[in-house]
Each structure stands twice: as C-alpha cells, then as structure tokens.
Amino acid sequence: MQPLQILSIVALVVAAIIAIVVWSIVFILIRKILRQRKIDRLIDRIRERAEDSGNESEGIRKELSALVEMGHDAPGDIDDL
C-alpha cells in the first residue's frame, strides 16, 4: 500500500471516531433538554393546581368570614341548650 492510501484510511477512521463522539454528545444533550422540558411541564401543572386550590380556599375563607360577621363566631361550636 502506498502512503497516500494509508493516510486516507487513517483519516476515514479518525473522521468516523469524531462523528461518533459528536453525535453521542448531541444525543446526550437532547435527552437532557427533553427531560428538562418534562420537569418544566410538571412544575407548571403543580403551580396551576396550587393556584386553583388557593382560589377555592379563598372562597371558603370568604364564606366563613361572612358567617362570623352574621354572629356565628365558631360554626361548629353551638351551645343553644
């Protein structure tokens, strides 16, 4: 074999190794990005649910404060015996 053929074979092998390394890094980064998107979606869903449950509890608080204003200090504690 001539030196040019040997050099071209070595160059192809090196190029293949570099391509494998680069695509492996790309694959790992894509997995990280997709995992982070899933985490972000879960965090958004948790925030939405927390906001929803917070709104419901505010409504309950308003109803309880309205009862207290009507004269019932403790709705569960009635001593009318």
Swiss-Prot record:
GO terms for cellular component: host cell membrane; membrane. It is a single-pass type I membrane protein. It is found in: Host membrane. Residues 1-7 are extracellular. One of its GO terms (molecular function) is CD4 receptor binding. This is Protein Vpu. The chain crosses the membrane at residues 8-28. Keywords: AIDS, Apoptosis, Host membrane, Host-virus interaction, Inhibition of host innate immune response by virus, Inhibition of host tetherin by virus, Ion channel, Ion transport, Membrane, Phosphoprotein, Transmembrane, Transmembrane helix, Transport, Viral immunoevasion. Homopentamer. Interacts with host CD4 and BRTC; these interactions induce proteasomal degradation of CD4. Interacts with host BST2; this interaction leads to the degradation of host BST2. Interacts with host FBXW11. Interacts with host AP1M1; this interaction plays a role in the mistrafficking and subsequent degradation of host BST2. Interacts with host RANBP2; this interaction allows Vpu to down-regulate host BLM sumoylation. HIV-1 lineages are divided in three main groups, M (for Major), O (for Outlier), and N (for New, or Non-M, Non-O). The vast majority of strains found worldwide belong to the group M. Group O seems to be endemic to and largely confined to Cameroon and neighboring countries in West Central Africa, where these viruses represent a small minority of HIV-1 strains. The group N is represented by a limited number of isolates from Cameroonian persons. The group M is further subdivided in 9 clades or subtypes (A to D, F to H, J and K). It comes from the Viruses. It holds the Pfam family Vpu. Belongs to the HIV-1 VPU protein family. InterPro entries: Vpu, Vpu_cyt_dom_sf. Residues 29-81 are cytoplasmic. The gene is vpu. Phosphorylated by host CK2. This phosphorylation is necessary for interaction with human BTRC and degradation of CD4. Enhances virion budding by targeting host CD4 and Tetherin/BST2 to proteasome degradation. Degradation of CD4 prevents any unwanted premature interactions between viral Env and its host receptor CD4 in the endoplasmic reticulum. Degradation of antiretroviral protein Tetherin/BST2 is important for virion budding, as BST2 tethers new viral particles to the host cell membrane. Mechanistically, Vpu bridges either CD4 or BST2 to BTRC, a substrate recognition subunit of the Skp1/Cullin/F-box protein E3 ubiquitin ligase, induces their ubiquitination and subsequent proteasomal degradation. The lineage of its organism: Viruses, Riboviria, Pararnavirae, Artverviricota, Revtraviricetes. The modification Phosphoserine is found at S53, S57. Ion channel activity is inhibited by hexamethylene amiloride in vitro. One of its GO terms (biological process) is symbiont-mediated suppression of host innate immune response. The N-terminus and transmembrane domains are required for self-oligomerization and proper virion budding, whereas the cytoplasmic domain is required for CD4 degradation. The cytoplasmic domain is composed of 2 amphipathic alpha helix that form a U-shape. Its main location: host cell.
